[in-house]
């Protein structure tokens, strides 16, 4: 029973739409009505400005990061392979990612999983996240597309998990990569058409 409570709590924390909340509280804006219509960090930068964008990014990363430690904090007794699986920090963190992408508070229309996924990876393997961050910003510096940088970093996470032979991370990162690519499908189309906005601060 405690495992179910832990997973539900992870989902509900992940589902907190930080971009939407900050937009409403401090800017009187529904971020879904501007830019890409997304509630995540990238659209927060675009619609609410850099300070708010950084805050949303931090909060989205933090909500993924903190859920990884739920199995340590909750008095959960894993007495079989199934319960052991669902008390793994990555799996608990995955529920936060799913909450971010499909938040119950906003009729299951949320962000694109990038920052919250980064928080989960930070919690389980900070060195891998550092490598992925270097790749992300390297691609961003060259091409100026946040969406492309996110997709490439996600794919590199899948490859990296195979290299370090972390197969639970592999399964999670593969699933998240698929979700991330699907969520960025309109961005991909715009990139091929030359219509995707480029960042100007790098």
Swiss-Prot record:
Reactions this protein catalyses: an acyl phosphate + sn-glycerol 3-phosphate = a 1-acyl-sn-glycero-3-phosphate + phosphate
Signal sequence coordinates: none
Disulfide bond positions: none
Keyword ATP-binding: no
Subcellular localization, as worded in the UniProt entry: Cell membrane
GO cellular component, one term: plasma membrane
Transmembrane segments: 2-22, 54-74, 85-105, 120-140, 141-161, 162-182
Keyword set, alphabetical order: Cell membrane, Lipid biosynthesis, Lipid metabolism, Membrane, Phospholipid biosynthesis, Phospholipid metabolism, Transferase, Transmembrane, Transmembrane helix
An example Gene Ontology molecular-function term: acyl-phosphate glycerol-3-phosphate acyltransferase activity
Membrane topology summary: Multi-pass membrane protein
Pathway annotation from the record: Lipid metabolism; phospholipid metabolism
InterPro entries (alphabetical): G3P_acylTferase_PlsY
Keyword Chaperone attached: no
Pfam families: G3P_acyltransf (PF02660)
Enzyme Commission number: 2.3.1.275
GO biological process, alphabetically ordered: phospholipid biosynthetic process
Domain of life from the UniProt record: Bacteria
Assigned protein family: Belongs to the PlsY family.
Quaternary structure (record): Probably interacts with PlsX.
Function: Catalyzes the transfer of an acyl group from acyl-phosphate (acyl-PO(4)) to glycerol-3-phosphate (G3P) to form lysophosphatidic acid (LPA). This enzyme utilizes acyl-phosphate as fatty acyl donor, but not acyl-CoA or acyl-ACP.
Protein name: Glycerol-3-phosphate acyltransferase
Organism: Staphylococcus haemolyticus (strain JCSC1435)
Recorded name of the encoding gene: plsY
